[in-house]
Amino acid sequence: MKNILNRLINHETLSKQEAKNMLVNISNGSYNPSQIASFLTVYMMRNITINELAGFREALLELCIPIDLSAYNTIDLCGTGGDGKDTFNISTLASFVTAGAGIKVAKHGNYGVSSISGSSNVMENLGIKFSNDPIFLEKCIDQAGICVLHAPLFHPAMKNVAPIRKELAVKTFFNMLGPMVNPSFPKNQLVGVFNLELARMYSYLYQNTKTNYTILHSLDGYDEISLTGNTKTITNKMEGMLKPEDFGVNLLSQTDIQGGTTIQESAQMFVTILSGKGTEAQNNVVCANAGMAIATVNNLNPIQGFELAKESLLSGKGLETLKKLQQLSL
């Protein structure tokens, strides 16, 4: 580790294999917490390279506990987090709305690190059972249309890193990796990232896979469609720019999509919105993200996806999905 840290301090970069080896060694407990924290800090001070990101990703996927959901045409809606915006849980809400519209969802998530309440914090608060049992997860997909893949249960290799990330409480390269290491290897992905450079890296890595994907970055910094401005999109077919009017809605302000200040408040807000009792702004931003997921899977244009998402939300189908998952979790 000393040699690697000295090289990194001297502004050198790692090869893909070196990056992979580092993560494997971290997972094996080869380094102490101070060394791991120093290693993570390097990537807060300079941009990660494509080779480094690819190596880290390869290590995590090789070390993960895989779950076979290949019988289903699933999508994961997942953002990197780390955008510093503290929105409510938009991608998790959009996941339930997407499932309510009949699309199978394999939602990969974790506890919040740089935010107050991550996807797993809200799911746990609402009584959703975390499991890596394939029979239980298939049952969830079959009966509720969605399963929740709580990252620590599938990435035991990262147990040495979790407490350090929590103590640092800022985004690290693990934020960048989260959406890329879904252990069910979904056929479709809607991925939000916190900057344009990372969007390009994701595109470069995803174009060498069979994944049907849409990568999103709102130009004012959000790792999702925020409707507070335009959103850059990169798919396996094209690049584009989404405007709020592409969904037939008005521009929002940042305060319209602010999250709760506690996990409890975030969970209450989650249920309120999923019950169709959210503000128009909250409904629109959830349906824009769910709509893009639906459009990605079914090859539709954004407004077609948006209308299907809105029908799922306002008819109560999204809420019914949550209730089914809660019942299965008992």
UniProtKB/Swiss-Prot annotation:
Broad class of enzyme this protein falls into: transferase
Residues noted as binding anthranilate 1 in the record, renumbered to the chain: 79, 110
NCBIfam families hit by this protein: trpD
Names of the cofactor(s): Mg(2+)
Matching InterPro entries: Anthranilate_Pribosyl_Tfrase (IPR005940), Glycosyl_Trfase_fam3 (IPR000312), Glycosyl_Trfase_fam3_N_dom (IPR017459), Glycosyl_Trfase_fam3_N_dom_sf (IPR036320), Nuc_phospho_transferase (IPR035902)
Binding site for 5-phospho-alpha-D-ribose 1-diphosphate: 79, 82-83, 87, 89-92, 107-115, 119
Gene: trpD
Enzyme Commission number(s) from the entry: 2.4.2.18
Family recorded in the similarity comment: Belongs to the anthranilate phosphoribosyltransferase family.
Catalytic activity, reaction form: N-(5-phospho-beta-D-ribosyl)anthranilate + diphosphate = 5-phospho-alpha-D-ribose 1-diphosphate + anthranilate
Entry keywords, A to Z: Amino-acid biosynthesis, Aromatic amino acid biosynthesis, Glycosyltransferase, Magnesium, Metal-binding, Transferase, Tryptophan biosynthesis
GO BP: any one term: L-tryptophan biosynthetic process
Protein name: Anthranilate phosphoribosyltransferase
Pathway connected to this protein: Amino-acid biosynthesis; L-tryptophan biosynthesis; L-tryptophan from chorismate: step 2/5
